[in-house]
A protein has these predicted regions:
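The N-lobe alphaC helix and its flanking beta3-alphaC-beta4 segment of protein kinase-like domains
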Residues: 54-72
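Conserved hydrophobic core/spine positions of the Hanks-type protein kinase catalytic domain
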Residues: 115-122
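Protein kinase-like catalytic core scaffold
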Residues: 40, 75, 89, 145-148
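Conserved structural core of kinase catalytic domains
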Residues: 55, 74-113
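C-lobe/activation-segment region of protein kinase-like
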Residues: 125-129, 140-160
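ATP-binding glycine-rich loop module of kinase domains
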Residues: 18-60
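Juxta-kinase regulatory segment immediately upstream of eukaryotic protein kinase catalytic domains
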Residues: 1-19
Length: 160
């Protein structure tokens, strides 16, 4: 995939208009997209090298991680559709500011740290870590969402 932002992407034959690039992560590009009625996050898996992380089957990993976190009870956007062939995921769009942006604007509340700690309690009891980078958390209506699906087996050096 080139660095140009696509104007349209499909998921299992359904077309979505791309509004903007939300971000690029280790495993893919996340776009704000619309079907004309609702807004979604449409993630396109990429295969660009990452010097500090080894991937297997990225699209299957996303699905497995989503199901693992859902079972644990982590507050996150719903996976609405997955297109295995084109390596695309359609997610619920959680509108709000990232913790990263809130830190920059000095708008972080102690309740958000408490919500992360509550997530950690669930995660650690299930031998799981998530990616705690501040751009992976969005606040909507005072609720903190983990918007990435990445998770791994618990390792002390990666805990919160």
């Amino acid at each position: 995939m080139s660095n140009a932002i696509p104007t349209e992407l499909s998921v299992n034959g359904k077309n979505y208009s791309v509004i903007k690039l939300l971000g690029k992560g280790k495993g893919g590009y996340s776009y704000l997209a619309s079907d004309g009625t609702n807004q979604y996050v449409l993630k396109q898996i990429h295969h660009e090298p990452c010097s500090y992380y080894q991937f297997g089957d990225k699209i299957q990993s996303e699905l497995n991680d989503y199901n693992r976190l859902k079972k644990i009870g982590i507050t996150m956007p719903k996976m609405l559709d997955i297109d295995i062939e084109n390596e695309r995921i359609l997610k619920e769009y959680i509108e709000g500011d990232t913790i990263f942006d809130m830190v920059k604007a000095d708008r972080v509340k102690s309740e958000y740290a408490e919500q992360v700690k509550a997530m950690c309690k669930l995660l650690y009891a299930n031998n799981t870590n998530i990616d705690y980078f501040p751009t992976n958390f969005v606040v909507q209506n005072e609720t903190l969402y983990y918007i990435d699906y990445e998770c791994n087996d618990y390792m002390e050096e990666w805990n919160f």
